[in-house]
């Protein structure tokens, strides 16, 4: 008889039940090695469309394709066994109609095996979120600063500084909650607003540049370990700097190759003795 203990994967229902409890730990993951490292630590692994910038070198997330998200999402699901895996829906894949959103979200879930999808938007997406959740697709919403709408918003800036803007964000939070989202990312939103809506709505809020009062926090893993330094948002805390470590390893390798000291005998195959 096998004594192997099967690890239970965290579900969207588990995430929703964490409202007001121990804060949720969320990080992005795009590749198999990172997913394996983060899986025991994180409640949610978010396959973010930020991969367009940190993996593919794009200037924004707007050119990320559905195929990219599916490929990376599948790798993260295959390489994790505990965390709830959520995949971002890229720009243009869900805004046209409820039917388009369902078709593409269903494809992402079927081809990746993820637990849920994430959509950016508030009141304008409430009908779509309801359409999806009624048909068995769990949705994580995303309000406040929405990177996919950065051009329409006039660039990256903190949201909610004026009362009309703050009330719009609170209205978005109420709308996506009523539509059936199981959680919501609150990005780049002034702390009093993020704190107030976290207390008001019944689903977990996951902050990024919002407030410690949110029900969880998310960061981009490449920001956290210093691998992405094209720019560093105010809300990023760098917990490690791997760039000099990787650079030093590559420099040492290059020096040994040029000196013909690598590969050494221990790294080569010899002829079998007769």
Curated annotation (Swiss-Prot):
Active site positions: 187 (proton acceptor)
Binding-site positions, 3-methyl-2-oxobutanoate: 49-50, 88, 118
Name of the molecule in the record: 3-methyl-2-oxobutanoate hydroxymethyltransferase
PANTHER family attached to this UniProt entry: 3-METHYL-2-OXOBUTANOATE HYDROXYMETHYLTRANSFERASE
GO BP, one annotated term: pantothenate biosynthetic process
Disulfide bonds: none
InterPro entries noted in UniProt: Pantoate_hydroxy_MeTrfase, Pyrv/PenolPyrv_kinase-like_dom, Pyrv_kinase-like_dom_sf
Lineage: Bacteria, Pseudomonadati, Pseudomonadota, Alphaproteobacteria, Rhodospirillales
Organism name: Paramagnetospirillum magneticum (strain ATCC 700264 / AMB-1)
Gene name linked to the record: panB
Family recorded in the similarity comment: Belongs to the PanB family.
